């Protein structure tokens, strides 16, 4: 299995256990699905004596619903205005570009060329996207994007802002 981590804070964003495709050699498109996790509390863990006279009053099960990618990687929703997102993405793209020029100069030009149309598409349809960051919530990290296509959530991650770790 491959775990994809944010280059800057180093937190896990997703793994290859989800269907992943590469868009324009720059953006990973990851297909998620809505799921509900139910957490039941064992009555024995609460303690006390069960009454022989009364009826059973157990504890209620709690549940949490969300997108599997978000829940598995403990991503945190991050609300930004379009203007604030533009400020963040400019700074983030510069950081990625600088990192690429140090480590993979050949990829730097490809990244700059191919990422611009995707960013433009996101900005044109910004209200349709939700933003998520890794659990460290570092300001220098990637903001992953999620957009719903009907009943299916898709998350988008910048390929060049990720490190791959085989486990």
Curated annotation (Swiss-Prot):
**Per the record, what is one GO cellular component?**
cytoplasm
SUPFAM superfamilies membership:
Mss4-like (SSF51316)
Q: Where in the cell is it found?
A: Cytoplasm
Induction remark: By cadmium.
- Which keywords label this protein? Calcium, Cytoplasm
Q: Boundaries of each TCTP domain copy?
A: 1-167
- Name the domain of life: Eukaryota
Principal subcellular localisation of the protein: cytoplasm
- GO MF annotations for this entry? calcium ion binding
What family does the database annotate?
Belongs to the TCTP family.
PANTHER family xrefs = TRANSLATIONALLY CONTROLLED TUMOR PROTEIN-RELATED, TRANSLATIONALLY-CONTROLLED TUMOR PROTEIN
Described function: Involved in calcium binding and microtubule stabilization.
Task: Please give the name of this protein.
Answer: Translationally-controlled tumor protein homolog
Which organism encodes this protein?
A: Lumbricus rubellus (Humus earthworm)
């Amino acid at each position: 299995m491959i775990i994809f981590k944010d280059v800057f804070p180093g937190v896990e964003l997703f793994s290859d256990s989800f269907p992943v495709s590469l868009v324009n050699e720059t953006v990973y498109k990851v297909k998620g699905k809505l799921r509900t996790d139910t957490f039941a509390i064992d009555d024995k863990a609460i303690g006390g004596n069960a009454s022989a006279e009364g009826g059973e009053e157990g504890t209620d099960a709690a549940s949490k619903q969300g997108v599997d990618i978000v829940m598995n990687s403990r991503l945190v929703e991050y609300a930004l205005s379009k203007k604030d997102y533009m400020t963040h993405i400019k700074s983030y793209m510069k950081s990625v570009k600088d990192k690429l020029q140090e480590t993979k100069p050949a990829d730097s030009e490809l990244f700059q060329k191919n990422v611009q149309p995707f960013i433009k598409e996101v900005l044109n349809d910004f209200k349709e996207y939700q933003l998520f960051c890794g659990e460290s919530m570092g300001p220098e990290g990637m903001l992953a994007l999620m957009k719903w296509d009907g009943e299916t959530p898709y998350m988008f991650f910048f390929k060049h802002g990720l490190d791959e770790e085989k486990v």
